[in-house]
Curated annotation (Swiss-Prot):
Swiss-Prot/TrEMBL GO biological process terms: translation
Protein name as catalogued: Large ribosomal subunit protein uL22c
Subcellular location: Plastid, Chloroplast
CC annotations in GO: chloroplast; large ribosomal subunit
UniProt similarity note: Belongs to the universal ribosomal protein uL22 family.
Species whose genome carries this gene: Porphyra purpurea
Lineage: Eukaryota, Rhodophyta, Bangiophyceae, Bangiales, Bangiaceae
InterPro entries for the chain: Ribosomal_uL22 (IPR001063), Ribosomal_uL22_bac/chlpt-type (IPR005727), Ribosomal_uL22_bac/org-type (IPR047867), Ribosomal_uL22_CS (IPR018260), Ribosomal_uL22_sf (IPR036394)
HAMAP family, per the entry: Ribosomal_uL22_B (MF_01331_B)
Length: 116
C-alpha cells in the first residue's frame, strides 16, 4: 500500500546571482532537508559568501509559504535546494605587450522549496 502525503510546497528563486554554482552547492548541501529555523541559524554563522544570498532566498520562501499558502514558519522544512548554472559574464584583463586574458565571471540561479 503506497501512501503519499499531500505536501503544499512553496518555492523562491534567486536568479543571476554573481556566485559560482559550485560554491553555492557547498552551502545548499548543508541545509537541504533541515527545518526552516535551523537552516537560518546555520546560514547566519557559516563563513561563506553564498550564505547571505541563500538566507535571503530562504526568508523569501518562508514569507511566500506564510502569505500565499497559510503555512506556519515554525513547522516548515526545506524540501528542495539546488543551484543551476546561469550565464557567464565574459571580461578581459589587459596583460603585457598588448595581450588580453579572458576572465569568466559565473552566475547561478538558486531555487529553494519549503513545505510542512
Amino acid at each position: 500500500m503506497n501512501i503519499t502525503k499531500n505536501l503544499k510546497e512553496t518555492k523562491a528563486v534567486g536568479k543571476y546571482i554573481r556566485l559560482s554554482p559550485h560554491k553555492v552547492r557547498r552551502v545548499l548541501d548543508q541545509i537541504r532537508g533541515r527545518k526552516y529555523q535551523e537552516a537560518l541559524i546555520i546560514l547566519e554563522f557559516m563563513p561563506y559568501r553564498a550564505c547571505y544570498h541563500i538566507k535571503q532566498i530562504l526568508e523569501s520562501a518562508g514569507a511566500n509559504a506564510e502569505h500565499n499558502n497559510g503555512l506556519n514558519k515554525n513547522q516548515l522544512f526545506i524540501t528542495k535546494a539546488f543551484a543551476d548554472k546561469g550565464p557567464t559574464l565574459k571580461r578581459f584583463q589587459p596583460r603585457a605587450q598588448g595581450r588580453a586574458f579572458p576572465i569568466h565571471k559565473p552566475t547561478c540561479h538558486i531555487t529553494l522549496g519549503v513545505s510542512e
